[in-house]
Amino acid sequence: MKAWIWFTFVACLFAASTEAASNLVCYYDSSSYTREGLGKLLNPDLEIALQFCSHLVYGYAGLRGENLQAYSMNENLDIYKHQFSEVTSLKRKYPHLKVLLSVGGDHDIDPDHPNKYIDLLEGEKVRQIGFIRSAYDLVKTYGFDGLDLAYQFPKNKPRKVHGDLGLAWKSIKKLFTGDFIVDPHAALHKEQFTALVRDVKDSLRADGFLLSLTVLPNVNSTWYFDIPALNGLVDFVNLATFDFLTPARNPEEADYSAPIYHPDGSKDRLAHLNADFQVEYWLSQGFPSNKINLGVATYGNAWKLTKDSGLEGVPVVPETSGPAPEGFQSQKPGLLSYAEICGKLSNPQNQFLKGNESPLRRVSDPTKRFGGIAYRPVDGQITEGIWVSYDDPDSASNKAAYARVKNLGGVALFDLSYDDFRGQCSGDKYPILRAIKYRL
C-alpha cells in the first residue's frame, strides 16, 4: 500500500511538471503576407511552424474609430482573399492547434481617433455591446477558437538618464509608476476594463471560446489590470516582456531591450525593465503561474551609433542617434528580424568586408540573463555604426528554461514572421521557435 501511495505521489508530481510550460503561443502578423521580398510570409511558410505551436494568435483586427466596433484592418486579405478562413482551416491538419483572433496590438494606429480604446471603456454600454458583438461575429464566422485582447493603454513614458543626485528617490518613485503618470484616470479605466472583459467573456462562454489577454510592452500592469479579478475571466495572459528600451523611445542611449533579470543598478536602470519583475508582479497578485506565458521577441532593436558612442559597445551606450536604418526584411527603422541580424554577424561570406559593410561584433552573454548584443562602432573606416539588442536561439532557450523554473504556462513568441522562417542562418527554419519548443 505504501509503495502504491508513493507511486501515485510521484506520478502526480510528474503530471504537474509536464503540465507547466506546455504552451507555445505563436503570434502571426498577417501584414507579413503583403510584404515584399524575403520578408513575405506565405501560408506554406506559416504551416511549417504549426507543428511546434499550441496556439496561433492571428494579428490583427482593429477597433473602428467611428463606431468602436471590431473589424478586419485588411478586408481584402482577411475576408475577400479568405486568409481568415485559410488559416483557421489549418486546424484540420494540426488538430492540437487553437487559433485566436487578436484585437488591438501596436498595429492599430488611427491618427483621427488616437484614444479610441479608452473611448470604448468610457463609452455608453450600447457601444461596448457593439464591440463585443462584432468581435464575437468575427470569431464565430471565420472559425477561430477564441479572442485575444491586445488592448491599447497609454504607455509609460520613456526612461531618462539621471545623475547620482536624487537617484535613490527617483528609483523609488519610478519602481511601480514608470517615469511619470500618463493617465490620471487609470484607476477608473482599470475598473472599466475589468467590466468589459467580463462582458466579453460572457459572450464567448456559451460557445466555449477562449479569451486571452496580451499585455503590450511598456503598459503598466499596476494601473490597468485588476489581476485577481482577471484570473476568473481569461484563460491565459501573454506578457510582452521585451521592448523595454527601443531606439524610438530612447533615441539617445542604447541598452538591453529584453533582459530576463535586472542588470546591475549602477547605471540608473529602472527595476521594472526586465521580464522577471513583470512575471513576479503578476504572481504577487495571485495570478496562477500556469496561466502566464512569457513573451519572447524574434527581432532585435537597433540603434544608430555616433563617434561619441565609444568603441566598446558595453551598455548603457551613450550618444546614440535614434533608430538604425531599416533592414531588407523587416522594413522598419530600428528593428531587425533575427534573419537580418544573423546575416550581419561574422560569417565566411562577410568576414573580410571592411568599412560600413564589415560584420557586427557579437558579444555573448555568459550569465544567460540579459540577451545578445552585436555592434559595429564608428571609427576611422566606419561611418554607419549600429548597436543591436536581441534574442537568438540560445537566449530564447534560456527564457524557455526560466518559464519552466517558474512553472509558467509557457512562452509566447512575437512573432513568426521575424524568426528565420526561410532557414537562411543555419539551414533550420524557425530556429528561435524550435529552440523554445525543445526547452519547454
Swiss-Prot record:
Checking CDD domains in the record gives: GH18_IDGF
- Glycan-bearing residues: N220
Cystine crosslinks: C26-C53, C342-C425
Query: What Gene3D superfamilies is this protein classified in?
Result: 3.10.50.10, Glycosidases
Give the subcellular location: Secreted
Q: In which tissues is it expressed?
A: Primarily expressed in yolk cells and fat body. In larvae, it is expressed in the imaginal ring and weakly expressed in imaginal disks. More strongly expressed than Idgf1 and Idgf3.
Has UniProt tagged this entry with the keyword Ribonucleoprotein?
no
Check the UniProt entry and state the signal peptide residues, or none: 1-20
Gene Ontology biological-process entries: carbohydrate metabolic process; chitin catabolic process; imaginal disc development; negative regulation of apoptotic process; positive regulation of cell population proliferation
Look up the further comments and give them.
Lacks the typical Glu active site in position 152 that is replaced by a Gln residue, preventing the hydrolase activity. Its precise function remains unclear.
Protein name, per record: Chitinase-like protein Idgf2
Q: Which gene encodes it?
A: Idgf2
